[in-house]
Amino acid sequence: MSETADTNQTAVVLFSGGQDSTTCLAWALARYHRVHTVAFDYGQRHRVELACRQRVREAIGQHFAGWGARLGEDHLLDLTSLGEISDTSLTRERAIEIRDSGLPDTFVPGRNLLFLTYAAALAWRLQARHLITGVCETDYSGYPDCRDDTIKALQVALNLGMDSHFVLHTPLMWRDKAQTWALAETLGGADLVELIAEHTHTCYLGDRTQRHDWGYGCGECPACRLRAQGWRRHRGLC
């Protein structure tokens, strides 16, 4: 929601290891003196992203010394029960299809609501006021838990429920994928763009056997198509 922050405060970034969350991590590292990260194992078929996120953290420490010094604790939380109750193509080995509702069956009901609730509970313990998530309402699949109204409502609920003053930041909310690539370049130059292309993971099928100019992936799933189209627009190739 907010695009400004106090550099003397602490943040928690919901960091999956994908393009969007890595860009958000860079955004937070440019603003806060201490930035913790959290991810969730919810039985996702593309759980290779959980290994990628460690390589991203290591690469940030190696190539961005100032940012590396600000990186705080990393947390991986077990939410496999979400995968057990979800009947989706992100948590089952099946083809990706569009439901009668118009939503793709990659939508995992409650996922971002739970992620942010757990992240807020962690932030409460760490005395971190700022929560950063990479949800957006532009180049996305229509997921209702990615919408700006949802995040604003959740911020109110979390603050009431924890008697706190959290600020939920969504740096990508009104940016498309081309603008997300551009933001990464603004934040960390060509080195960050290359880090994202090489080390992050977006593909819903978990494919890291095919390397494209925009990164690894099957090239056919909705996540790969959005990432590839954004890259081409950012590079002026379409």
Swiss-Prot record:
Q: Which cofactor does it need?
A: Zn(2+)
Which Gene Ontology BP terms does the record give? queuosine biosynthetic process
**Superkingdom per UniProt:** Bacteria
Binding locations of ATP: F15, S16, G17, G18, Q19, D20, S21, T22, T23, C24, L25
Which annotated residues bind Zn(2+)? C203, C218, C221, C224
UniProt xrefs under Gene3D superfamilies: HUPs
Query: Which keywords accompany this UniProt record?
Result: ATP-binding, Ligase, Metal-binding, Nucleotide-binding, Queuosine biosynthesis, Zinc
Pathway membership of this protein?
Purine metabolism; 7-cyano-7-deazaguanine biosynthesis
* Membrane-spanning residues: none
Co-factor binding details: Binds 1 zinc ion per subunit.
Any GO molecular function: ligase activity, forming carbon-nitrogen bonds
- What pairs make up the disulfide bonds? none
- EC number(s) given by UniProt: 6.3.4.20
Q: Which Pfam families match?
A: QueC
- InterPro entries named among the record's database cross-references: QueC, Rossmann-like_a/b/a_fold
Q: Which reaction does it catalyse?
A: 7-carboxy-7-deazaguanine + NH4(+) + ATP = 7-cyano-7-deazaguanine + ADP + phosphate + H2O + H(+)
Q: Which family does it belong to?
A: Belongs to the QueC family.
Q: What does this protein do?
A: Catalyzes the ATP-dependent conversion of 7-carboxy-7-deazaguanine (CDG) to 7-cyano-7-deazaguanine (preQ(0)).
Put simply, this protein is called 7-cyano-7-deazaguanine synthase
This protein's species is Alkalilimnicola ehrlichii (strain ATCC BAA-1101 / DSM 17681 / MLHE-1)
Q: Taxonomy-wise, where does this protein's organism fall, top ranks first?
A: Bacteria, Pseudomonadati, Pseudomonadota, Gammaproteobacteria, Chromatiales
